[in-house]
Design a protein with these regions (language model features):
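Conserved hydrophobic/aromatic beta-strand scaffold that supports enzyme active sites
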Residues: 44-48, 66, 85, 93-95, ...
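A short beta-strand-loop-beta hairpin characteristic of the jelly-roll/cupin
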Residues: 54, 63-90
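A short, N-terminal "cap"/entry segment at the start of jelly-roll beta-barrel domains
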Residues: 1-41, 56, 128-132
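Histidine-centered divalent metal-coordination motifs
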Residues: 58-60, 102
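Ligand-binding loop in jelly-roll beta-barrel domains
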Residues: 85, 89-90, 98-125
Length: 132
């Protein structure tokens, strides 16, 4: 049996993205969010990290993340003391469990690192994390 609703599909153009957060040198723009399209269970954004820069160490209190590396390469630090280093490059997928401390780093001195980020909540709660 098919269910049909009156809800309409929406296209968000690149000039209509929602500016979200800056974490360290990383900026993130949402294309699908509660505020932008009324999403009820999903969030999709593009994160950009300039050459030689990184996000702040952080974790997401209320959601898992799935990340796709669409441009560039670098490292993805994870663990309570960011003690685990994962090399990342174009085409890689990254799974981040809820509450997992992480920090993407762009090692390139010339190319940006671009990450497509999906989450299983329309509104995320991000907490910056201080490594001791």
């Amino acid at each position: 049996m098919n269910k049909h609703t009156e809800a309409e599909c929406k296209v968000i153009k690149s000039d209509g993205l929602e500016v979200e957060i800056s974490s360290g040198s990383m900026t993130r723009l949402a294309g699908v969010s509660q505020g932008l399209v009324g999403a009820e269970g999903i969030h999709l954004a593009v994160a950009n990290i300039p050459p030689g820069c990184a996000s702040s160490p952080h974790h997401h209190v209320n959601c898992e993340s799935a990340i796709y590396v669409s441009k560039g390469s670098g490292r993805f630090l994870t663990g309570p003391q960011l003690e685990t280093t994962l090399d990342i490059e174009v085409g890689d997928f990254i799974y981040v469990p809820q509450g997992s401390v992480h920090q993407p780093i762009n090692d390139s001195l010339s190319d940006p690192l671009e990450l497509i980020v999906a989450r299983n909540t329309p509104v995320e709660i991000v907490e910056e994390y201080e490594v001791s």
